[in-house]
Amino acid sequence: MNTSPGIELGLFIALLAVLNIPLGTHLYKVLDKEGKTVFDPILKPLENLTYKLCSIDRSKEQSWIEYAVGLLCFNFVGILVSYLILRLQSILPLNPEKIGPMAPHIAFNTAISFATNTNWQSYVPEKQVSYFAQMFGLAVPNFTSAATGIAAAAALVRGIVRTEMKTVGNCWVDLIRIHYYLLLPLSLFIAIILLSQGVPQNFNAYVSYIPLELKSSLANLPVKLPQGPIASQEAIKLLGTNGGGFLNANSAHPYENPTPLSNFVEMLSIFLIPSALTYYFGLSCKKLGHGWSIWLTMTFCFLILTLSCFIFEQAGNPLFSSLGIKNQLNMEGKEMRFGIFDSSFFASVTTLASCGAVNSLHDSFQPLAGMIPLFNMGLGELIFGGVGSGLYGILLFVILSVFLFGLMIGRTPGYLGKRIGSYEIKMAVLALMIQYVLILGLSALALNSSWGTAALGNKGPHGLTEVLYAFTSTTENNGSAFGGLNATSKPFALLLGVAMFLGRYFVLIPILAIAGSLANQKRYASQTVFPTGGWLFIFVLGATIFLLAALNFFPALTVGPILEHFMIGMGKSF
């Protein structure tokens, strides 16, 4: 893409800010069960019919425990259905390539992966998943997992806003309205844009052809060109910050991401809902300035990390100098139509959000550039983050910032008129510690096992980074990978599945517990010690985020990508 990096980045942020207001306002209406949207004339009858068929009383609200149980049951049923579809796809329709059943341990890993919004892929979609399984076993969880995250965020926002109430909403009403009024219309719109750029949408059998370079060779072997309903799945893959590709090359494949314009639209789609949720939060608590302050904190962090990734990658490979190569640019693992900036830009966007879609190979980045996507995920997927999970993730850090600020000035911590007590802090720390323990603990377990070291594609610090990246990606529900790691073995598939499951649901429960606790509190007029807007808020929140991430991950990063960077400088590679 020939556009100046500065212009493209500026346009991206400007569009994100402009779209924040209408989409955030729409979210506010969607997450209010009495809210009226522009889609009511078409979708209201369908919504009411769904309530009737499912025997849902929309007027009844739930405690945080009931809300959590509802979300968990909804997701567990989804995991089971996806698993069965993947195992039985050989006898199900829409399978022109006669693809057989997926192996049990891979199906287990995949079902959990898509239900938890991770979309880690330990399989080759073109060879191992039928059209039916793609649409019903994988695309449907793309919607349900996104709706789950948004519903959990809405429950936390209600907990902050409400006073002396024991309920945080109705999970079934939230899930239905999020699907009908938000995800489906947006997905249709993005799918049409992608179709206009050349993304396929069909049910044809794969096309056999002989590439030009093979016609003159003795091989003369036909190659199969995949087909399928790609555009429809691509849209929700991005909007729902899911990330699982219809094709193995993901958004590097021209069928999923054919042009620079489609690339820009895909990146914008990833951040669209997480960004708008900050405006929804500001509307809900009647403090738009506070919502914008959170958005600015996210944006500043995003700019710093994106530019760092680009600068590190643009510096090139120092090993080229010893080979007499003048052009040191590292184009390995990158598409020529995107180049270094758009590859670095996409990598930063997809790892700051819990998306995991890729348009380049992160494993081929220079050590410090590859460290940025890893560090992004280690922050906790809260710089815009996943749909829903980004908002409740950063609100955890707001609560911790409030607590630390209150301790420093000797005042009882308070946030938007609510007291932040020991219970809220314990739940917030529990949600964060679960992630850190899983990432570092499971990485250590894999690196100290024979099956773990046997899966390494590279030795030395790069091999350590591959394993650390895998468990960070799965625990934080991102799904991107350092491709040098062979994670298809039974131990890896099962352990990564456990990481995804615990990293999603064992974080969700403390979030909803905080929502229930805050909703039950009175609002104290004087309980606003911590500023909810301005540069002090942005600085304290940003510092808290980076401080906690640095304390937890810096030791691992020093013996991984940082060590590899210095060793490459000395002429050693892995």
Swiss-Prot record:
Pfam families per the UniProt record, alphabetical: KdpA
GO cellular component: plasma membrane
One Gene Ontology MF term: P-type potassium transmembrane transporter activity
Annotated InterPro entries: KdpA
Membrane topology category: Multi-pass membrane protein
Disulfide bonds: none
Keywords, ordered alphabetically: Cell inner membrane, Cell membrane, Ion transport, Membrane, Potassium, Potassium transport, Transmembrane, Transmembrane helix, Transport
Entry superkingdom: Bacteria
TM regions (residue ranges): 7-27, 65-85, 136-156, 175-195, 264-284, 292-312, 390-410, 427-447, 494-514, 534-554
Subcellular location as annotated: Cell inner membrane
Function per UniProt: Part of the high-affinity ATP-driven potassium transport (or Kdp) system, which catalyzes the hydrolysis of ATP coupled with the electrogenic transport of potassium into the cytoplasm. This subunit binds the periplasmic potassium ions and delivers the ions to the membrane domain of KdpB through an intramembrane tunnel.
Assembly notes: The system is composed of three essential subunits: KdpA, KdpB and KdpC.
Family recorded in the similarity comment: Belongs to the KdpA family.
Protein name (record): Potassium-transporting ATPase potassium-binding subunit
Phylogenetic lineage: Bacteria, Pseudomonadati, Verrucomicrobiota, Methylacidiphilae, Methylacidiphilales
